[in-house]
Amino acid sequence: MKQILFVGLGLIGGSLASNLRYYHDDIEITAFDADTSQLDKALSIGIIDYQSTDYKTSVENADIIIYATPVQQTVKYLQDLPNYQLKKHVIITDTGSTKSTIQQYEQFLLNHDIHLVGGHPMAGSHKSGVLNAKKHLFENAFYILVHNETDNDAAFEEIQHLLQTTSAKFISTTAEEHDFVTGIVSHVPHIIASSLVHLNAQHVEDSSLVKTLAAGGFRDITRIASSNPIMWRDITIENKNTILRILKEWKNQMSDVINIIEHNNPDELYDFFNDAKVYRDQLPLKQQGALSVEYDLYVDIPDKPGMISKVTNILSLHNISISNLRILEVREDIYGALRVSFKNPQDRKDGADALSDFDTYFD
């Protein structure tokens, strides 16, 4: 039996453990977590075989160690690994959102016959903790794997083979490229979304409508600002240099936009909006990227009693689950008065088919 050790067993670690436990008969899973209540819960729902409060014994018995901990905590673990009597050719991977800080230890560990393959599963949920773990959490999500040394090629292949059951889409890249791309598509957008929310909050006293009307499109485009602030504080610190470089580019672009508006140039304004529209319309629709995704269907319903229950009853009859449902009070540029959110694009498509008697729309 191959021995797999999880260090950290929250939503991500728990979901990976759940998937491996379900699909692999040739492994045993042990978990170590400072929060022992997470271990008790994981054991009770059957996603691990053993729980451990003895880190030293656990790492020394493991064939593969998966660190599902914050990046700075993972770094401390990596620095300390050569002090233990680990198995020959032990493989290490992680689930951190930044990779450069982790991968700088690849050669250091390789000198001790410890094989590091950095990992970043680009999936998550607004819920946390092992009780919210799902074995299918990573389906169709991008899963980044990083290694620089050819001596880690075999470890890379073994980790990818082990994780194939997640049905994730694996991408191999460098730590530098990973941190640059996630900075553009995830980290900086989170900062901008939070900034927009702060801007809204600063003007609430000017008019109560600022908050009231934010219930529509503004709330949608700033949804990511509701993410875990501790996690995003740490990500921002870890990817500081890349984030600052991108933010300065964005600042310059905003200066250009201000200049266009000040000079009342309609052609340049049109180009600004149209170029963005054309590029965005070309972005993939069915792939889960760096930002968490909700698959929304907009349904046009009349303002009559029983219409919402009619929609949900139809979906229930077709065994289609929904993750959220909301009446849109402010829906400028959005078709439909009811927004129904689904867990995946297939459920959304099935929902649209089931609700064919209604006018529906999704992006």
From Swiss-Prot:
Belongs to the prephenate/arogenate dehydrogenase family. Residues 2-291 form the Prephenate/arogenate dehydrogenase domain. Keywords: Amino-acid biosynthesis, Aromatic amino acid biosynthesis, NAD, Oxidoreductase, Tyrosine biosynthesis. This is Prephenate dehydrogenase. Transmembrane segments: none annotated. One of its GO terms (biological process) is tyrosine biosynthetic process. NAD(+) binds at residues 3-33. Residues 296-363 form the ACT domain. The keyword Chloroplast does not apply. It comes from Staphylococcus saprophyticus subsp. saprophyticus (strain ATCC 15305 / DSM 20229 / NCIMB 8711 / NCTC 7292 / S-41). It catalyses: prephenate + NAD(+) = 3-(4-hydroxyphenyl)pyruvate + CO2 + NADH. The gene is tyrA.
